[in-house]
Amino acid sequence: MTIQTNLIENLLFFLNYMELEAVRKSIVSFIKTEVHNRGTTGAVIGVSGGIDSAVMVALAAEALGNEHVFGLILPDSDITPISDVIDATNLCIKLNIEFRKIYINEPKAGFQKILDETENRLLQGNLVARIRMCIMYYYSGLLKKLVLGTSNKTELELGYFTKYGDGGADLLPLGDLYKTNVFELARHLNIPENITNKKSSARLWPGQVTEEELGVSFPLLDGILKRINELYCAVDSKKVYDLDEKIIKDLAEDFPSIDLDSIRGVYKLSRLNRHKVTPPPVCKF
């Protein structure tokens, strides 16, 4: 075992069977309690064919009963691989939940027709994510169910989601689990291998792969994020000159196999995107 592997294991909470069971029970209880306390009839979940939504649907069905979970499969035929649509459909059938499949190309085209043209694929991708959010909340109101988001701790700490898009949700049951742990939980829940073995992607543009985009594998990425939190807790920011550069230097020493540009990129995302997970500032009178 390499020093690098030892470091990752120390930084992350790799979970054994009993710990995964405790996580499962905790999330199931959380969903059940929140849905009951808010007086709603169940949950609406976007089912993408990816690992996060698969775990979310499985846990929601366990918590609420499959009859109280409604799945929405919202592909964009310009971007979404047909394998994702098939995997999402088969998962809903396997879990015996009601679902609808709605291609979002038509509303996307409607927006593009009236908006200024742009080649910026991030803007186009965010538009797609927000169209999905609108559909999710339409059915949330129609069915009197809560929208369960599928964002994990890695995405939340990086801000790797669309504000008021896939980040728009009533509950975030996976929000305290790093992506590495979501993979573990998926295997624990016997999520089909064609989903657990799939390369993660937000599907904001064709060919997008999360790890390739960020330049870091999930175990290392999660290790970096956890280390950033530890470094922030260990210092008094008022007494440390150029804190950002100090933390980047410490991260480079802790993760020598990762190039400095990738470390800077991860750190920059985690700092710049904090606004995504905090409420908009209110002017107090």
Feature map (PLM): residue ranges:
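ATP/NTP-dependent adenylation/nucleotidyl-transfer catalytic domains that generate, transfer
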Residues: 2-42, 59-62, 68-70, 74-107, ...
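Short glycine-rich or small-residue beta-strand-to-loop segments that form or flank ligand, phosphate
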Residues: 44-47
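Conserved G/P- and acidic residue-centered "switch" motifs that form tight phosphate/ATP-binding loops
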Residues: 50
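Catalytic nucleophile loop
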Residues: 53
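Catalytic-core regions of hydrolytic enzymes
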Residues: 130
